[in-house]
From Swiss-Prot:
Protein's UniProt name: UPF0311 protein Rpal_1987
Organism encoding this protein: Rhodopseudomonas palustris (strain TIE-1)
NCBIfam families per UniProt: PRK00872.1-1
Recorded family membership: Belongs to the UPF0311 family.
Pfam families: DUF3237
The organism's place on the tree of life at top rank: Bacteria
């Protein structure tokens, strides 16, 4: 019997983002830094706000594959602060990736954008975030990134 992998949707992170800062070509690609300005977290049993600090650190490889590593935090409505490290990749047809870079709309279904969020918190209500693996299915918009977070069962 082939093993299966099941997931369940748990919440959505909508992170508002600022203007891109480029550190230029670093030998392995172009380094970009995108500030996280705030946002919201919404799901069953968890809701709150993305705190206005942190950033998404990216390298755009020569083949246009984008490697991402975002570090930020959110605060739940009941006062828990949750630190987030979210690594992932974004890839698709070059012409669509170029549109995204220019802030133009692109159908998210046409871009492969997946992440592996990790969470840390000392709040007892949210220890489960540190006791499971999660996968994010994400979409990039001109002013925000939307990540649907799924728990691996």
């Amino acid at each position: 019997m082939t093993p299966t992998l099941e997931t369940k949707y748990v919440f959505t992170i909508t992170a508002r983002i600022g203007d891109v800062t480029s550190a230029g070509e670093i030998g392995t690609g172009v380094r970009r830094i995108i500030p996280i300005l705030g946002g919201e977290v919404k799901g069953e049993g968890i809701s709150g706000k993305v705190l206005p600090f942190g950033a998404d650190f990216q390298i755009i490889r020569p083949n246009e594959l984008i490697e991402l590593e975002a570090k930020y935090a959110f605060e739940t409505d009941d006062g828990a602060v949750v630190y987030v490290e979210n690594a992932g990749i974004r890839f698709g047809p070059v012409e669509l990736l170029q549109k995204l870079k220019c802030g133009e709309p692109v159908d998210p279904k046409l871009i492969y954008f997946r992440t592996r969020p990790r969470f840390e918190t000392g709040h007892p209500n949210y220890q489960w975030l540190m006791q499971h693996l999660f996968i994010g299915s994400a979409a990039r918009h001109a002013d925000r990134v939307v990540i649907d977070v799924h728990q691996v069962l």
